[in-house]
């Protein structure tokens, strides 16, 4: 049987093919055409609007005859590709892998790439697809090893993902320490994004506390989640209710999946045996991911099966901490090193991945901030010795040239917590709270 164009391109590459050869003889001539782009839809050396240049940018031409071809007017690419030579080892978790993914991340966040949804890294030995949702960049596949035998199937799956993107970003809010403000974060982050016109679903998966459900003045389910996890016919959409707040000028709404009070007395071991697997909630949630822009899941402070269900359903994990809570900082490192990889190993996408931490609430003096930064530096050094690179999760703006220890801080503000008594998100009734969470959403989620 004759080789396909992808197989032929891969097979003729010399073992030490440099970046130029991989770019010309694999990416431009075979990979991008296999992904559905013709020569007028591909531009090399694309300036992304900051100081970074992508090796390739691509975008399907519009059907509007009056609009120029992407080659003629390269604007609003849908895909960027970063290429390296075969001597670059970009296998997962290598130093070169971290370097190339950071390059791609910087390119995707360029001013000329606000519409870009996809990024690819490849050296013709490996390939990985990344999804960009606003400012959030996360894996859409694992870093896959290429061979003549599998290249067609791998690229076919990548093309399918690119052509059928999920609308929603699914975020689980987690810390193994209680009292960190996960529920308050979930409510107000969802509410501020709804205010900005986004379609939002928040999920209360903390069945013992049910704080999110109660804070919004909603009624808990009585057996719905049990049925959802054990009965194939139960549709998640049937359990969703709409929270509405009527302002002076307009109303704001977002959807909620309330907690299930029956889960409190449920035998989790028996429930786990009855459910199809840890993928159960993910599969029930998946059809709704094209109906929402953002889905937020509030989970309990533990690593039991229900928390793992929510993690499996997530693209990313948001990790609130407190600067004066030693354990909340150390629990972040444990989650990134131990807990998240357990879930990533089970999924084809290699998700969820952690977003950078933030300090949630509490008044923070300069000496307290310095103490927290020093403790974080100790955590980073300790895990560095074990081969884990945690600095980007604690100090996302750190570079070799600029040792920036910035950590986003949502300050302590009594109105935010007091708003729960009124069953109204604080961002809908208080300007200061509104600005806190708007700043948070802009830094973490919106481009």
Show the residue positions of the predicted features:
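C-terminal boundary of histidine-terminating zinc-finger modules
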Residues: 410-441
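Conserved catalytic-core segment of NTP-binding enzymes
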Residues: 290, 294-399
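Short, flexible/disordered intra-domain loops and linkers
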Residues: 89-99, 219-228, 266-273, 327-331, ...
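Cytosolic-facing regulatory segments adjacent to core modules
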Residues: 237-304
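A short, conserved, highly charged catalytic patch centered on acidic carboxylates
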Residues: 1-118, 132-169, 363
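Walker A/P-loop phosphate-binding motif and the immediately C-terminal alpha-helix
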Residues: 167-209
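Active-site signature of alpha/beta-hydrolase-fold catalytic machinery across serine-
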Residues: 188, 192, 215, 309
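Phosphate-binding loop that captures ATP/GTP phosphates
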Residues: 207-258, 396
């Amino acid at each position: 049987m004759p080789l396909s164009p992808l197989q032929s391109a891969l097979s003729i590459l010399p073992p030490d093919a440099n970046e130029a050869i991989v770019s010309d003889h694999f990416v431009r001539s075979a990979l991008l055409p296999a992904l559905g782009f013709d020569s007028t839809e591909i531009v090399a050396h694309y300036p992304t609007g900051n100081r970074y240049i992508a090796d390739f940018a691509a975008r399907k031409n519009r059907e509007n005859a009056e609009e120029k071809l992407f080659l003629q007017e390269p604007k609003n690419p849908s895909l960027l590709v970063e290429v390296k030579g075969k001597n670059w080892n970009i296998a997962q978790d290598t130093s070169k892998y971290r370097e190339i993914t950071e390059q791609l991340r910087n390119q995707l966040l360029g001013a000329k790439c606000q519409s870009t949804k996809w990024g690819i890294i490849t050296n013709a030995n490996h390939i990985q697809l990344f999804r960009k949702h606003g400012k959030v960049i996360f894996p859409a596949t694992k870093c896959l090893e290429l061979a003549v035998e599998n290249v067609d199937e791998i690229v076919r799956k990548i093309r399918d993902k690119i052509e059928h993107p999920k609308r929603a970003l699914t975020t689980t809010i987690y810390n193994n320490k209680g009292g960190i403000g996960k529920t308050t974060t979930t409510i107000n982050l969802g509410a501020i994004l709804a205010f900005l016109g986004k379609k939002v679903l928040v999920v209360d998966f903390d069945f013992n506390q049910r704080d999110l459900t109660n804070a919004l003045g909603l009624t808990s389910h009585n057996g719905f989640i049990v049925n959802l996890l054990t009965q194939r016919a139960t549709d998640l959409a049937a359990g969703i209710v709409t929270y509405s707040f009527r302002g002076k000028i307009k109303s704001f709404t977002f959807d909620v999946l309330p907690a299930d009070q029956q889960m409190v007395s449920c035998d989790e071991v028996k429930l786990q045996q009855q459910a199809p697997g840890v993928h159960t909630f993910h599969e029930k949630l998946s059809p709704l991911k094209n109906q929402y822009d953002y889905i937020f899941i509030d989970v309990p402070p533990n690593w039991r099966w229900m928390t793992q269900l929510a993690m499996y359903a997530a693209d990313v994990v948001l990790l609130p901490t407190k600067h004066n809570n030693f354990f909340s900082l150390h629990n972040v490192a444990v989650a990134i090193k131990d807990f998240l990889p357990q879930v990533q190993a089970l999924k084809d996408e290699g998700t969820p991945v952690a977003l950078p931490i933030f300090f949630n609430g509490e008044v923070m003096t300069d000496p307290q901030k310095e103490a927290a930064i020093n403790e974080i530096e100790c955590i980073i050094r300790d895990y560095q010795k074990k081969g884990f690179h945690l600095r980007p999760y604690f100090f996302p703006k750190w570079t070799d040239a600029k040792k920036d220890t910035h950590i986003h801080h949502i300050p302590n503000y009594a109105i935010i917590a007091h708003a729960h008594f009124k069953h109204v998100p604080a961002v809908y009734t208080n300007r200061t709270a509104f600005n806190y969470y708007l700043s948070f959403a802009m830094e973490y989620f919106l481009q």
